[in-house]
Amino acid sequence: SKAIVDAKKGAIFTKYAKLISVAARKGSDPTINFSLRMAIDKAKSANMPKENVERAIKRGAGELGGAQIEELIYEGIGPAKSQFIIKCLTDNKNRTASEIRHILAEVGGSLGSVLWNFELKGVILISAEELKSKNLINNDDFELELIDAGIQNLVKENALLEARYYIG
């Protein structure tokens, strides 16, 4: 049972190490690089050792040897003309492209251009309690600020504020 727990931890740590490495390519300083800061926070919440985090940052920044992990986006068409945008982290583009092609082919799909049919949107979820506890701004003023900032859809549900916006 210890071996099973260790294997699960190892898989989680590997996942977070890849996320940290990819984020570190945009800059190795977490105070400036928000995506790196978020990846580090997620890794810490999973109790990933500090040495592993630092090694992943160095690998992403190019300070260590070994294969570079890259983020790739594939577009595919699946069964019943369903459309997919597939984001991958990989150290080998050719192997990943082959695997994606194979997976799509197994269900009668193929790689194809579908990105034109999607809009890139962001979603912000804010707890009303958290907003109130910080005493930064009242809810109504905050909602007005979001609308002024270009939020397209604002939904209040169960003390949670959801804001959707177009990234363009």
Report the location of each language-model feature:
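Intrinsically disordered, Lys/Arg-rich N-terminal extensions and targeting peptides
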Residues: 1-29
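Helical mechanochemical/support elements of P-loop NTPase systems and associated helical scaffolds
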Residues: 9-12, 16, 32-36, 49, ...
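Residue-level signature of catalytic and energy-coupling elements of molecular machines
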Residues: 20, 47, 53, 100, ...
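Translation machinery proteins
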Residues: 32-85
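Short flexible coil/turn linkers enriched for glycine and charged/polar residues
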Residues: 78-82, 91-94, 118-120, 157-159
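Short glycine-/aliphatic-rich beta-strand segments at the starts of folded cytosolic domains
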Residues: 84, 116-132, 161
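Short, surface-exposed ligand-recognition loops at beta-strand->loop->(often short) alpha-helix junctions
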Residues: 89-93, 125-137, 165-168
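A common structural junction motif
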Residues: 104-111, 148-153
